[in-house]
Amino acid sequence: MAKEATRVRRRERKNIVSGVAHVNASFNNTMITITDAQGNTISWSSAGAMGFKGSRKSTPYAAQVAAEDAGRKAAEHGMRTLEVEVSGPGSGRESALRALQAAGFTVTSIRDVTPIPHNGCRPRKRRRV
């Protein structure tokens, strides 16, 4: 019995004008996900996905390259305006935001959605270097 040929699904070009850019800047990596208003992912990128390894993932330059890549993919779908939600304490927050603006997106609002505990879990021990 012949094996059925696997069909390659082409990524259909959605025409979405505005969306939300979620920038998650942790201490070790920076992830950028661009979604539509409902939260469906349009494009994503991260410093690790752009080929940075180890401690280079946490640099502002790696966040800038990842944001440019995610922005380029989103622009292919016709996206022009973005709301930006920044989360996390990492060093790539501002550089990712600047890269999205430099990529030609109109940033309508910037929100910091970093979760702050009202004295929740016990924090990890202090580093002694």
Curated annotation (Swiss-Prot):
One GO CC term, this protein: ribosome
Annotated InterPro entries: Ribosomal_uS11 (IPR001971), Ribosomal_uS11_bac-type (IPR019981), Ribosomal_uS11_CS (IPR018102), Ribosomal_uS11_sf (IPR036967)
General function of this protein: Located on the platform of the 30S subunit, it bridges several disparate RNA helices of the 16S rRNA. Forms part of the Shine-Dalgarno cleft in the 70S ribosome.
- Which Gene Ontology terms describe the biological processes this protein takes part in? translation
Identification of the protein by name: Small ribosomal subunit protein uS11
Classify the source by domain of life. Answer: Bacteria
By which gene is this protein encoded?
rpsK
Keywords, A to Z, come to: Ribonucleoprotein, Ribosomal protein, RNA-binding, rRNA-binding
> What does the annotation say about its assembly with partners?
Part of the 30S ribosomal subunit. Interacts with proteins S7 and S18. Binds to IF-3.
Cross-referenced PROSITE patterns, in alphabetical order?
A: RIBOSOMAL_S11
Member of which family?
Answer: Belongs to the universal ribosomal protein uS11 family.
Under Pfam families, the record lists:
Ribosomal_S11
What's a single GO MF annotation on this record?
Answer: rRNA binding
Say if the entry is tagged with keyword Transport. no
